[in-house]
């Protein structure tokens, strides 16, 4: 189960039950507080006084996205900071948004941000940078992609009937050509060939080449960047982080606490998200060193087996090549974007927070990232994005909160309330905050507070949690409540005993050309069952009043161990491990589970045993 253990709460011999006093400080209609009341037992007055005091600290108060979306004027910036203070906020993320008239990253922009930092500091509030013009992080408003080598790239698959060789035109940036025999949409056999004349009669010519992302107005006439390319990432850091450092680097780690990275991704896998061109569903991520790195890590040549990446082979829904491909992409993203970014920030005193692109379903994680939990490992305060109201993706904050517990991270962020609309009441804001707090969210980033609602800005993810809303003078009650709640949780350890092996790696191997619809919907029955089991298992556990964390197999391989009857990931130990719905499991995970069970740990396999180990089919 889940128990909240209060650190240092019994420093004296005073054993009076102060639970009701605590509940009078924080309203009782919150599930987390009832959990606290019935699990903690006795709480001393010293602890309660500390909670009241801590609840007033900016550290525990929300920091909204301050949508800087017009012509910035210092008097108006100062006025709005005062409004934030009155609304109970503890600072703000300084965020360029649609409608910005001041030149992004220009001298005036930098002066205005420095002014905001100083004004926030005068009021005892925190400043947090945001690393992009709108989103996603990496382009500096598109300018990084002016250099063509930095642009997002994809492998493209083209299928044609040209067995006589006359209709084939070798594309620019050619990779490989195959003669392929299909049975419907499944591979029967394939052979790499050197020319179209070698295509066997009755078979298809399947050609692979790579292409740059097409320019887009969203990126100011350029593209997203190749986040798998370390040189592109260096250019991004130089264009943004280094510029901020030169302007006000002496404030890093002091007045300026950290920086928000938003919707980082490595490009879409078979779903065309953000691409939008006619071939987008035929595309998977590519970078210059892809084939070299793949062979180094997986010990075989991806070029020789590209058809198995795209198509189901020999009656199997699961592809070892697709499984390996997503794994290599994940490793390259971490090595070339995540780790260098975090290293730069650590060396310069900035906390890294934010969230990646699409965390909801397994398909979302697979198509745009691979493993969100592996990415969270390298964020100081891992975070999520929860759009809309009553968006009960309970397992998403649990993914970030699990990593935070396992690797000792102080806060877990949620970018919340975005596009929730103008009908939201204060009770609605509290309700959506409550369930996320119960799932481990301790750093609130309300989305969005408009600088102005002129022009296009008024259509940017309403409502505005700012003075444009009539209730803004009453909103402080919401934030006072949550700041005290977060102060409570900062003094607590959530003693979760149960671990669920996260099934995302099974989704990697079920990915294929034609396997996704409407971006994140899946077409194959086995993939649908995997998604359903993922949702149903966590929901069932929660409804039974039991808590559980998730364990990512990559993180288990890196930081897992069995010790004294507990299975540890990093610094968090578990008494019980649940394996449910997996199509594949790592051999390293199995070995650790065997060791854990031998020490007296409990391992529960729910439903069928995985059919694959390390992506290879089990034959006995």
Residue spans of the language-model regions?
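Extended, non-globular alpha-helical segments
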Residues: 81-84
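Short, small-residue-biased leader/transition segments that mark boundaries at the very start
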Residues: 1-6
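Short, low-complexity, charge-dense intrinsically disordered segments
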Residues: 7, 13-34
């Amino acid at each position: 189960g889940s128990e909240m253990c209060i650190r240092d709460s019994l420093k004296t011999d005073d054993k009076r039950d102060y639970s009701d006093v605590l509940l009078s400080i924080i309203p009782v209609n919150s599930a987390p507080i009832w959990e606290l009341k019935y699990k903690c037992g006795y709480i001393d007055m010293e602890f309660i006084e500390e909670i009241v005091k801590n609840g007033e600290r900016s550290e525990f108060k929300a920091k909204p996205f301050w949508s800087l979306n017009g012509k910035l004027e210092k008097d108006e910036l100062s006025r709005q900071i005062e409004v934030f203070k009155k609304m109970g906020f503890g600072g703000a993320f300084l965020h360029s948004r649609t409608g910005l008239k001041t030149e992004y990253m220009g001298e005036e922009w930098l002066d205005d941000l420095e002014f905001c930092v100083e004004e926030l500091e005068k009021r005892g509030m925190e400043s947090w940078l945001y690393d992009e013009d709108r989103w996603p992080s990496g382009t500096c408003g598109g300018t990084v992609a002016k250099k063509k080598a930095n642009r997002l790239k994809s492998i493209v698959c083209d299928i044609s009937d040209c067995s006589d060789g006359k209709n084939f035109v070798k594309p620019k940036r050619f990779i490989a050509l195959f003669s392929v025999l299909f049975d419907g949409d499944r591979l029967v056999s394939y052979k790499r060939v050197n020319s179209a004349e070698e295509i066997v009669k009755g078979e298809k010519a399947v050609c692979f080449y790579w292409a740059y992302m097409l320019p887009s107005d969203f990126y100011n006439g350029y593209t997203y960047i190749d986040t798998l390319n370390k040189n592109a990432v260096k250019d991004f850091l130089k264009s943004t982080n280094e510029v901020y450092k030169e302007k006000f680097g002496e404030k890093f780690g002091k007045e300026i606490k950290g920086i928000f990275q938003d919707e980082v991704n490595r490009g879409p896998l078979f779903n065309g998200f953000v691409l939008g061109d006619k071939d987008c569903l035929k595309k998977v991520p590519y970078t210059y060193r892809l084939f070299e790195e793949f062979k180094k890590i997986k010990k075989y040549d991806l070029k020789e087996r590209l058809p198995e990446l795209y198509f189901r082979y020999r009656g199997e829904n699961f592809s070892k090549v697709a499984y390996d491909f997503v794994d290599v992409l994940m490793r390259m993203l971490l090595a070339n974007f995540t780790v260098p970014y975090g290293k730069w920030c650590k060396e310069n005193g900035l906390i890294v927070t934010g969230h990646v692109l699409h965390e909801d379903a397994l398909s979302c994680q697979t198509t745009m990232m691979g493993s969100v939990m592996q990415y969270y490992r390298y964020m100081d305060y891992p975070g999520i994005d929860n759009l809309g109201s009553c968006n009960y993706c309970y397992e998403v904050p649990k993914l970030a909160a699990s990593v935070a517990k396992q690797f000792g991270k102080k806060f877990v962020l949620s970018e919340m309330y975005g596009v929730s609309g103008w009908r939201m009441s204060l009770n609605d804001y509290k309700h959506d905050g409550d369930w996320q707090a119960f799932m481990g969210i301790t750093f609130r980033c309300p989305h969005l507070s408009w600088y102005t609602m002129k022009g296009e800005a008024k259509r940017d993810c309403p409502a505005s949690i700012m003075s444009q809303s009539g209730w803004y003078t009453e909103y402080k009650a919401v934030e006072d409540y949550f700041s005290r709640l977060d102060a409570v949780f900062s003094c607590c350890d959530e003693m979760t005993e149960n671990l669920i092996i996260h099934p995302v790696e099974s989704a990697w191997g079920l990915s294929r050309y034609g396997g996704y619809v409407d971006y994140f919907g899946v077409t194959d029955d086995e993939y649908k069952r995997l998604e359903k089991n993922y949702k149903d298992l966590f929901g069932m556990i929660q409804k039974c009043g039991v808590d559980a964390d998730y364990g990512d197999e990559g993180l288990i391989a890196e930081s897992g161990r069995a010790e004294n009857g507990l299975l540890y990931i990093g610094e968090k130990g578990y008494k019980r491990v649940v394996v449910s719905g997996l199509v594949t499991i790592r051999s390293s995970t199995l070995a650790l589970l065997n060791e854990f069970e031998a020490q007296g740990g409990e391992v529960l396999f729910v439903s069928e045993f995985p059919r694959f180990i390390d992506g290879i089919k089990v034959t006995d």
